[in-house]
Amino acid sequence: QAATIEALLGPQDSVGEMTAEFERRRDYVMERLAEIPGVTCAAPRGAFYAFPNVSEHYRRTLDGSTIGGSLDLAEYLLEKALISLVPGEAFGAEDYIRISFATSMEALDKGLTRLKDALA
């Protein structure tokens, strides 16, 4: 309980810094997702993940894998592009995947480059 009080009433400098950093990461992810044909995404406003619609890539065959939905796509991306993300199916949103940006800019750059290449 004491930690909660300190978190709420103590210095808030780090909160502003982290908010700015997550906004920077969010903006970067949105910019990179916009470069990928067949992917659309509304900007997240209160979370540290993006939820892009990737349904235009369903019914495609990518590197020998037929993509039937978000689970197939997530498995393909994990196996072929070494990208870990969450299929939208887990949230009742089959047309989407969830991508966290609670990681380093370097990891985001690498992952988004791999995503773009895998869906090309």
Give the positions of each predicted feature:
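PLP-dependent class I/II
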Residues: 1-120
